[in-house]
Amino acid sequence: MDAAIQYILYFAVLVVLAVPLGRFMAHIMDGEHTFLSPVIAPVERGVYRLLRIDAAEQMGCRRYLASVLVFSGIGLVTLVALQALQSFLPGNPQHLPGVSWDLSFNTAASFITNTNWQSYSDETTLSYLVQFMGLTVQNFVSAGTGIAVMFALIRGFRQVKEQGLGSFWVDLTRTVLYVLIPLNLVFGICLAAGGVISNFQPAQKAELVEPVAVQPNADGGWSVIDGAQIEGDTVKVDGKVVEGARVVTEQFLPQGPAAPQVAIKQSGTNGGGFFGVNSAHPYENPSAFTNIIEMTSLLLIPAACCFAFGIGVKNTKQGKAIFAAMFILLVIFTGIIAVNEHAGTPQLADGGAVNIEMTDGQAGGNMEGKESRFGIASSSTWSAFTTAASNGSVNSMHDSYTPLGGFVQMLQIALGEVVFGGVGCGLYGMIGFAILTVFIAGLMVGRTPEFLGKKIEPGEMRWAVVLCLATPFAILVCSAIACMVPGLADQLNNGGAHGFSEALYAFTSCGGNNGSAFAGMNCNIPWINVMLGLEMLFARFMPIIGTLAIAGSLAKKGKVAESAGTLSTTNGMFVFLLVFIVLLIGALSFFPALALGPVAEFFQMIA
């Protein structure tokens, strides 16, 4: 019962907060007066004067796209330079060295694309300056870019025989100033009050209560020695000295300005953690209070985008229909993960090896890789939310989920981040599927497809296909190439079906702009870093190109009057068709690959 209440609470809070935020975002898009205008409007005008931005400019789709690409390219080069020059810059109390060229490129590509894939452990790789001047800035502007492109698409549907889609620079400025900064100021204060650390102190060392004996392992790291007898600096097991063993007496305690960066990495669907284990770290997510704030903020803006879309196109029912389709998919996927994690596995229950019964004192089920302070309900919901969005943050280890739990995580990402997805990009990704749906429905009834009063013709259909298939293409092609490289197996912690799942998840995560990982694959080698970086760039900007092409084409068209034969795109039937098409495309694209990974592992588990 407690678990059921948690699931209901998380979904209810999301819906209640998303509706007013969506209404607010629609006002921001059109530059209307809001309760924040007296404070922020002077700053907005100052930014326009400083950067010589024409607030009244109307860009065509090509100029809008060029602005997006140039802005992102500048961010890529700047972030690579910051990492390479890290050792010469201030704000580096740990005196960390510069980052290698391949990891710098991978990280820069990851953060400008809103993916936040991390082939490194933050606290031992990047300085405070690089984190808050490089990564955090990109967390804001990459999220703002996605919302700006969504605004352009809305104007494409709304305009009648016009060329302009608005100004990218104005849309980006308004999004950052009115939405992202105020929202994350509130979230950051709440997280800091809840115990998330926020300082600029160097890492601290603390004495352990008891010393621990470790020895080198095959992976180049250290493993704890079971049954060790420590006598000074000497380690013995059963009376015999262990050669090469080391006695650890101190613990490394990372510090840093985590709270404000955690806020934007959640609300901007960025996902890159301040610490290596992300929001499973007690410094980043210490309690149930911070957990619900971080989990709610994770999907808040993507959900609000649905309502902003409805208001923006002057058809609130359409926004609600898109939201309903996304919400239904999310509930289904969350339910599948939750049922499998609460049930555990036959191997855990075999002969009473592990007590998987739910009691007042324990969560039961499959608790491997999960934090006891969160349990299965909060962990399962987070994993569903973070893979539905293009977020990728974690409060548990996805590599330790049951086979079907991992299957759902990968499937949600592989669908093309359309189950709410990233800020802005999730909405325009789902619109691509909506256009595909009305096209198929139009074929069935013999009518030219229409959507929101605009005829959908071959030009829009070609770009809608690009929008829907860019992510599957990137994931499957890159995964296939990687699997043909002989050295890939050496980078995996496991073999067989689960080893394949680890590799497939990595390329799925980067192709879906998600950033989460099974963490069973060493990706910090040059060829993998470069391949993943290129995949992230392709999977981010091809859908943007398709979206702006559709927006530009629709803006030039006139409105078509509704008739008795016009397909309604706001009723339950359309919602059902949209959900069906999303699942159909996902199944046709990915089931063969998923069958070799998590599905095969599931049948091995129950055999």
Across the structure, where does each feature detected by a protein language model lie?
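Membrane-proximal intracellular helices of multi-pass ion channels
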Residues: 1-607
